[in-house]
């Protein structure tokens, strides 16, 4: 093979790997986080775990990616090790899908039907449709479909380029001699493992082997040990991802290794013993692309079947390899679900961000309600809890914000990118709500320390204000947690009512001050209190408006709120009226 032949082969390999990556990314984006959500909610049913593991891997075209994802789930405590075993088994079956697709390049025959099945017949059409969707469509889903079609077309073109480049090697004695060496089971396994470990994809390494079949020099006796080695080499990705993870995550990576390593040993021992007694006629024949796909599938299905009754043994083997220590019973870090491993699969990472953001929102809400209760019933321990929770919310903002910024730099769909931006805005508002909770607790502490108290009328007004603030807080956070846009639309009318409440309570305080029914010192406390209440309502409004804007694909906050209030929006006015009546202060003439 001359230099041009080598360049053609390497170029074909580059196109092949690029096409596989593009197709996998397109499939992953199109499926969104649905498949990952299914994995997160995995039951202990091993058959269901195997099927779902195979499905996810067939979709994202990478058993390594699935296994790394599983290692992340186990590391963050989302998935148990026993559940992970079934998914890992299924991933090994799902990864054979690529080899079956690539086997289409080996189709021979002159009939119309056989011609239509050849990639050279239909991939140009797929490429044209794909590039049309990518360049002309505004829909992100159609763009993803276009990416899948283009990726598949490039994958097949790269495969054919590699096959054509290596075809002349059929007459090369040195090449034939090298392949004959790999018919030695040990050398073949080592070669397959090294190749797969280097390119980090068993699907790609099997594809390269299928391309080599074009030379006619690859026999099944050579291909079998190489395929076995490829299944072992793919474990390197998961083992590397487990570095720095907890013990269960390391065990999950070892399960993947043991599954393939022991499965390979058992399969090869049985195969060569049977072949020695009853020689397989096909063993010394030239392999073709379909034959490679069959061998790849048979091994992975065989390994799954023999391990299925011994899943507990596989789990025990992992526990023996990575033993627990006495100090390993420390509580899990709640930020473990923000695992860097998930960043390789943005839809999974985004789901974890949402989960942490919900916890942060609940913590901020609980902190605010606790501080509001201190106004009527003060105790030092609750003040300490408010301060502790505020620090906890600060940590949430720091950890989650940093993770979201890392996630935002990844190749996200437009929808996921908008969700990341929404979360970044909302966690800032949650943090500010907890800050106002501390301010409110300081108002309560000042009143307690100085022996101050509100007048009866002021207490009645604050009680009504408390009700309105509790409702807007619950409405905004519940809407955020459930993605409920209709509920979010109830926040702004209530925020307008709260603004009016603050103004009216302040005016009433001034009247009482003039009549000598209230002191200036209490006036300062009251002003601080209702100002913090009103600011909390503003942050609730920010959260709701951000959700609505992303849903409506409109990002001018000032214009949105101005238009909402200025255009006599019927829904806004109706809700405003309902909330105004619900949180109406006692009649001024009677109270003053």
Whereabouts are the PLM-identified features?
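Interfacial loop-to-helix junctions that mark the boundaries of transmembrane helices
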Residues: 1-7, 109-121, 175-181, 221, ...
